[in-house]
Each structure stands twice: as C-alpha cells, then as structure tokens.
C-alpha cells in the first residue's frame, strides 16, 4: 500500500510532514481541512462560527469519504477520528499514521498560529479534546510516530514505512 493518511491533533505536524513526504516522493498531497474550506468558501473557524461544530464534522466526513487511492499523501483534520466510517474508508487504501505530539508542544504551536482553524466543541478546552481523542488515534493508526522529533526525522520515519 503506497498511500499514507496522517491523523493527530491540530498542530501536531500532519500537514507539514505530509507536504515534505509528498515532495520527497514526488507524489500529490491533500489536506482535508483545505478541501472543507474550498468547498465552503470560508475558513474552518468561519464555518464553525456560522454553521456550528457538528457541521464541520459532517463536512469533514463527506470530504474524507470522497477521497480514493489517487490521493497519495493525506492530512486529515484532528477530529476525523470521530468518524469510524471515515477511518475505515481511509484504511482501505492507505496506511494510517498517527503523529503523537505532546500536549505542551501542541499548545505552544496553537498559541503561535492563532489563525489556525481548530474545531473544538463549545465549552471544551484543548487538553480535554487531546485526552478524548488520544485513544481514538491509537485505535485507528497502523503506525505511531513521536511528534516531538524534528520534521526531518519524522519524514525519514515515514519514508521507511512508505514502501512496506
């Protein structure tokens, strides 16, 4: 299987690593968050504010279920793991890699990138989301990588698994 889908929290490095891997392998890359934004003509944050968190999740599922093996390197939104249908679908044509980045690092990155769209239900904090999703990331991933490694080390680790 030569396709890869990245899962993990927002700001864990999915898109950065995915783009770098795609570039190294000269393959295409797609970010499901960007597909949702393109489809709706708004940022994730604007979509969430206008239509609500559940709408974002439903859009994410639709976008993922429309993907196929022609998409070689895929970065999913952090909440994709809430849809078992989405995860099963990705698993039919790609290796699912979880970038397990410590909460402290994620919090720092989110602080720096405040423009980042983060679909968080009303009343929940990032540590709550992290703790809720972590078992789901473990459940659906074939491979777990340490997200505290440098981008280059993460890319090297992914490349080791790409042709298995």
Predicted regions and their residues:
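P-loop (Walker A) phosphate-binding loop of NTP-binding proteins
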Residues: 9
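NTP-dependent small-molecule kinase module
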Residues: 16, 20, 24, 134-164
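Post-Walker A helix-loop "phosphate-sensing" segment adjacent to the P-loop in P-loop NTPases
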Residues: 23-34
